[in-house]
Amino acid sequence: MEEVPPEKGEYPDPLEELPRARKEGASEELRRKWRKRFLGLVRIWEQGPWISSGPFGAQVVYADGKVFEIGETTVRFTEPLFHGVEYASPGWVLAIVVEHGGKKFLYSSDLQGPIIEDYAEWIAAEAPDVLVLDGPATYLRGPLQAAATLERAIRNCAEAVRGARARVTILDHHLTREPRFRDACREAFSAGAITGAEALGLPPLTDRLSTWKAKGKLEEMVERARAGELDSHLPSRGLSVDLLGL
């Protein structure tokens, strides 16, 4: 990879394409504050330098907003989506939609819920057969995430799951990092979502930790994990849900 001069271009405010977030999301005061991050990045982009694909050439493709046809499979990448709230400080992510044989798989990437209402609406409108959604970051409740933001993420997560009506919905990543996640997102789970561990026929690790602690086996299991003995069978374990036979 190598540095190159910046390309000329326009950088419209991404929030302009999110009408529901503007209406239902964070207050205008907060948005003005957060928008400064975006404007600061625009100045950096305009001044450069940028990174080229360098010696990788055609092997590296920037996927933002692109569609790829690979045999009978179509892979669609979204335009950049906020990594959380409007103008989120971690930046942007790309969601992916894969279509093959009349079936559709949607991977949300790291939307933290989604927090943004328009993203929940988009997921529902895609109506995938299989949905993998990262879920709200309930473990950040408190000083690292405002209650209003978490409530928004939980609400929009439920909207996405209910609206998509996917045959299989796997809700994981952020959500399963603390033991109270099921109660926080009961609407999404009531609509049929399962965790990644449950897709493998196992309880989530947070549940297993609670069980081991109650049985006085927590230290033993931690030592097994350190020795690489815990769940060593997982690479060869099949899914407990049928994704291929959709």
Each language-model region and where it sits:
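Structural motif
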Residues: 103-107, 130, 168
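Binuclear metal-ion centers of metallo-dependent hydrolases, dominated by the metallo-beta-lactamase
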Residues: 149-246
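Active-site environment of divalent metal-dependent phosphoester hydrolases
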Residues: 85, 112-117, 137-142, 175-180
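Proline-aspartate-enriched helix->loop->beta-strand connector
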Residues: 127-137, 166
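Core dinuclear metal-dependent hydrolase active-site scaffold
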Residues: 5-118, 205-246
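Short, acidic/turn-prone active-site loops that include or flank metal/cofactor-
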Residues: 135-138, 198-200
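Short, solvent-exposed loop/turn segments at secondary-structure boundaries
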Residues: 120, 143-147
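Short amphipathic alpha-helices and their capping/turn segments at secondary-structure boundaries
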Residues: 115-127
